[in-house]
Amino acid sequence: MKHILNKDKLFPTELTNIPDPPKEIFIESKNWQDLLDSPKLAVIGSRKASSYGQIVTEKLVRGVVARGVVIVSGLALGIDSLAHNAALGAGGKTIAVLPSGLDEIYPKGHYGLAKQIVKARGALLTEYSPKTVPFKYNFIARNRLISGISQAVLITEAAINSGSLHTANFALEQGKDVLVVPGPITSATSAGCNNLIKNGATPITSADDILEVLNISGNSHVKNQIFAANSAEYQILHSLSDGDLSNDDLHYQSKLDTAVFQQTISYLEITGRIKAVGGNIWTII
């Protein structure tokens, strides 16, 4: 753990320029300087993500991580943990901003995810000293750091009363871009997003839209990397990396049981990772 005062060189300059800047931060990271020098995007949203929210979050995170963008979120249930996991699965880096001390991971079920983030050369960050438990106020205060350390904030799914709207307000106060994924008008979990767009937030429908806002272009920073969120995805994508395969051959090479294979194939097709090209042959997109 590193204890960094706001006058230290390792203190993020982005956080010195926000209203109510923290006087100190505590971090756990093996790669802090590199993270400071990288473009950062906050990705937040509903704690009860729908299948739509899951798909768009993973797709957009993979797209920007491939350009070297670091994903910032709050380690919470739903969109937050999806964003962290998608970044890790894409071979990228991610920062989790906590509402508690570094020794009080919340929720406790995300202790393993927190360790994975650090192991993958990301970071845990908080303004709270060790042994501080996550009081209710801490969550809102934490949100200003999520937006503050990032160049822009992306909300992929949020209801009309979502806590993500606090972060959007902080971002606007800090002069940051608020990017929003539009959702179905029949979906309550996208009502907050659609309302933000009506009020002037930037609608986002692709990773390229985000990269344009961040002024990032060029080739992928993550080369020869299989972007997989879990071992089943990896087995299928790795099997296809040397060429197209029939459904039966792909099933055999992946060594997955039938139910997991079919579920993973369907998900990879829906999310635009693979496609069928006649005769039930699969290819990577």
List where the protein language model places each region.
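Glycine-biased, small-residue-rich flexible motifs in mid-sequence functional cores and linkers
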Residues: 1-285
